[in-house]
């Protein structure tokens, strides 16, 4: 059984408080009309884990009833968590924007004292960067000679293992990013509202780009909705040749949050339970990082969602950017090839029933049905190529 996105996504939905939803769902689970395999009600056919969260919903055999609507002000209070801490994980390679990025996220936070940074920073200026890190509250950096760690994912794992201290929420991003005002409280509020629909999840996307003018001033675009994922011709060709999915952003101006087939390396936001359940890997370097994270989160039962609202901006196409594969090809490409082989081996083993490198709450075949990416045949469905929302949430 599956839940179609259009069954769920209503921006005007009113929800009950979590305690009432949990009480309703516990009643449903004890009811003889409850189908345990699909979490549906035989009487109404609804998926009860979602229906029990809706304010206007009621049990078809009257075991629980609709609740009075919650005011927008009360709902905002419920979804806001002003005591929460956020850990920001950043890998950086010779990036002159790293400290501007850190300062921007501190300055724009509503609660900067609750923001914690863990940075793996590759740059020859080790003493300078260390001094910059200790100038700032809650900022820790592992300052390394370039080439010490090869790849974004191993660098993220290094930051996590050294610096993460059980913060409530987790923002994984790059060293060339900017934020909206009060990004911390806004993203937590949006995440908790979306969680009513998707349960535990990852917010992710290829966020809009910003630029810097010749005077060093940030140029932030007037874009308030995140792009969604689609596959360009080069992305399609790459998948056909390697079985490694890649995506490109497209501006579809969605009216709601959108189920995603993919995880962005430069932006994902989640809660601590997700990152503790699905840790980073040392086995992928760069290209395979995003599809592996998507598969790992998905097979662990964690949903992938692109939020409608923009919270952060990204500057990938910088004119002065340094790339390890250009500066250290002898070090990078052996690891790159090893990474590709690792990903391909995981796919082959998963198609033969193994969960090595993945998790067992959902299968790779569930992911194929969800995303339209057919590893088993090497084909791509039109819906994933065109960037339509992923098809359903498997139970």
Where are the language model's segments positioned?
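Catalytic cores of eukaryotic secretory-pathway lumenal/extracellular enzymes that build
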Residues: 78-377
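Cysteine-centered metal-binding/redox modules
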Residues: 1-77
């Amino acid at each position: 059984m599956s839940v179609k996105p259009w069954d769920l996504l209503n921006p005007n939905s009113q929800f009950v408080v979590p305690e009432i939803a949990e009480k309703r769902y516990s009643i449903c689970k004890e009811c003889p009309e409850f189908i345990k395999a699909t979490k549906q009600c035989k009487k109404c056919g609804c998926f009860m884990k979602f229906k029990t969260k809706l304010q206007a919903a009621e049990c078809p055999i009257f075991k629980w009833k609709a609740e009075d609507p919650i005011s927008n002000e009360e709902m905002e209070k419920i979804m806001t968590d002003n005591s929460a801490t956020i850990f920001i994980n950043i890998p950086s390679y010779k990036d002159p924007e790293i400290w501007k990025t850190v300062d921007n996220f501190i300055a724009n936070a509503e609660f900067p004292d609750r923001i914690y940074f863990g940075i793996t920073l590759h740059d020859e200026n080790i003493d300078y960067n260390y001094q910059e890190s200790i100038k700032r509250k809650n900022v820790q950096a592992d300052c390394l000679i370039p080439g010490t760690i090869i790849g974004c994912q191993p660098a993220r794992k290094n930051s996590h293992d050294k610096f993460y201290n059980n913060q409530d929420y987790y923002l994984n991003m790059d060293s060339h990013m900017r934020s909206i005002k009060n990004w911390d409280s806004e993203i937590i509020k949006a995440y908790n509202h979306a969680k009513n629909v998707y349960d535990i999840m990852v917010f992710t996307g290829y966020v809009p780009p910003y630029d810097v003018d010749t005077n060093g001033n940030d140029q932030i675009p007037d874009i308030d909705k995140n792009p969604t994922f689609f596959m360009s011709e080069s992305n399609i060709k790459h998948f056909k040749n390697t079985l490694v999915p890649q995506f490109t952003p497209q501006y579809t101006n969605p009216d709601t949050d959108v189920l995603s087939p993919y995880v962005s390396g430069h932006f994902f936001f989640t809660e601590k339970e997700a990152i503790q359940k699905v840790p980073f890997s040392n086995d992928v370097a760069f290209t395979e990082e995003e599809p592996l994270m998507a598969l790992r989160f998905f097979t662990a039962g964690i949903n992938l969602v692109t939020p409608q609202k923009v919270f952060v901006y990204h500057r990938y196409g910088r004119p002065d950017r340094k790339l390890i594969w250009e500066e250290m090809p002898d070090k990078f490409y052996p690891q790159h090839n090893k990474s590709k082989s690792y990903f391909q081996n995981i796919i082959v083993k998963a198609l033969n029933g193994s969960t090595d490198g993945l998790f067992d709450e959902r299968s790779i075949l569930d992911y194929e049905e969800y995303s339209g990416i057919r590893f088993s045949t090497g084909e791509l469905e039109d819906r994933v190529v065109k960037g339509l929302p992923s098809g359903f949430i498997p139970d």
